[in-house]
């Protein structure tokens, strides 16, 4: 069967004109003999508006009720798109995450997909040409609606592609994957191919075009992943395992993460109980920790790490609670930092990348406060005001 998953982000379906244009494009592909599973996000800023509504009512909504509310954004979009498709002669069916058989586990607002039954789609395609599925959502074992967290619609699309063993195309308001953010550097080049590994690093380190777990899912099931601009003839980027298609440069891209917070904790004694309680609480609240560094000496314990700024409420609550049990605990949460990262699979085989990056920042009068590395990336915590300057200096230094 000539079957694919297509996903359209919130900016691509932000108004009815765009939804109608997408419907016409989908009709053309159906007429060419394809069967399509279409995943959509909420229209434009719908999710933000729902959150603003909640803020007007309460500062402490229960996660279960909040998840239930947030799923309505995507459900509106699938209904609208399916209505338009049927109106222009395409036999379409709208499906919630629950109707699509997306079973989830974990936190109501950060659930993970546990299982998808592909037989649901085989049956549905007997009577329909297009299945329009609400992204970002599923249902848990208690029959409660859950959401998948940041990038959840991308994850939905890739998971559906994996369960059906078909390609996945993700359409948004960018032309593909760039070596760095073209909004920061106009000359940034678009990459025709990127390996799964490099894309995962770019996503994790702030590139923003795709969420890490959706790329990881594609890698695990070897699903070809395409990223392109909605309704554009310009070529996008293929994300795949064939790294031999890539240029063998040490550095493929530069990523700037502006959605981070830097946390520093000090305690006059090296106390393992403090660390145990801290990391247990972080795990329970599904707060991902990055760039961890720890110093233990005669003066006590100092721990630094970074988190996503979307976890601001959780980290504040966790640290306030710890302070009641460890009265000498001192902590600072700094939102005026950003993370600049170099990414490239060629780093495995080439030396001198770290020293060159170090000297570039020093010569550009850009101080950094923390460094971390992986096999194919190097990251620095720097002042927010130096973020865009660092992107430009490193991009040119490595002739990306």
Segments predicted by a language model, with ranges:
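A conserved regulatory-domain signal marking ACT and ACT-like small-molecule sensing domains
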Residues: 238-400
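Terminal amphipathic helices with adjacent charged low-complexity linkers/tails
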Residues: 41-47, 227-244, 300
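Acidic-aromatic/histidine active-site loop/patch
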Residues: 218
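Short hydrophobic alpha-helical runs that function as membrane-insertion/retention elements
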Residues: 167-172, 225-227, 290, 370
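Nucleotide/pyrophosphate-binding catalytic subdomain
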Residues: 1-215, 382-383
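Conserved beta-strand termini and adjacent loop/short-helix elements that scaffold enzyme active sites
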Residues: 95-97, 228-230, 292
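Surface-exposed amphipathic alpha-helical tracts and adjacent flexible/coil segments at the periphery
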Residues: 210, 221, 232-238, 312
């Amino acid at each position: 069967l000539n079957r694919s998953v297509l996903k359209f982000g919130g900016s691509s379906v932000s108004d009815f004109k765009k939804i109608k244009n997408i419907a016409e494009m989908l009709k053309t592909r159906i007429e060419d003999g394809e069967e399509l599973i279409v995943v959509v996000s909420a229209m434009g800023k719908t999710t933000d508006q729902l959150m603003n509504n909640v803020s007007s009512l309460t500062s402490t909504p229960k996660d279960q009720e909040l998840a239930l509310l947030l799923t309505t954004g995507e459900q509106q979009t699938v209904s609208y798109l399916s209505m338009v498709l049927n109106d222009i002669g395409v036999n379409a069916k709208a499906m919630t995450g629950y109707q699509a058989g997306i079973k989830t586990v974990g936190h109501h607002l950060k659930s993970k997909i546990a299982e998808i039954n592909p037989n649901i789609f085989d049956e549905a395609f007997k009577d329909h040409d297009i299945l329009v599925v609400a992204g970002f959502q599923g249902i848990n074992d208690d029959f409660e609606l859950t959401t998948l967290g940041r990038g959840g619609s991308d994850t939905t699309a890739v998971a559906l592609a994996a369960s059906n063993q078909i390609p996945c195309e993700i359409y948004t308001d960018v032309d593909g994957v760039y070596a760095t953010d073209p909004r920061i550097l106009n000359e940034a080049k678009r990459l025709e191919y990127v390996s799964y590994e490099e894309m995962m690093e770019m996503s994790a380190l702030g590139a923003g075009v795709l969420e890490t777990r959706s790329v990881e899912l594609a890698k695990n099931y070897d699903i070809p992943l395409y990223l392109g601009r909605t309704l554009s003839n310009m070529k996008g980027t293929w994300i795949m395992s064939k790294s031999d298609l890539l240029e063998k440069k040490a550095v493929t891209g530069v990523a700037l993460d502006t959605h981070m917070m830097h946390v520093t904790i000090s305690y006059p004694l090296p106390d393992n109980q403090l660390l145990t309680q801290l990391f247990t609480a972080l795990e329970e609240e599904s707060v991902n920790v990055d760039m961890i560094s720890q110093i233990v000496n005669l003066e006590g314990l100092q721990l630094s790490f970074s988190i996503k700024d979307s976890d601001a409420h959780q980290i504040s609550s966790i640290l306030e609670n710890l302070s009641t049990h460890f009265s000498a605990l001192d902590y600072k949460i700094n939102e005026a930092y950003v993370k600049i990262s170099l990414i490239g699979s060629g780093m495995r085989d080439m030396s001198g990348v770290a020293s060159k990056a170090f000297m570039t920042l020093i010569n550009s009068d850009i101080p950094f406060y923390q460094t971390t590395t992986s096999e194919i990336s190097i990251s620095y915590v720097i002042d927010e005001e130096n973020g865009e300057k660092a992107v430009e200096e490193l991009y040119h230094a490595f002739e990306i």
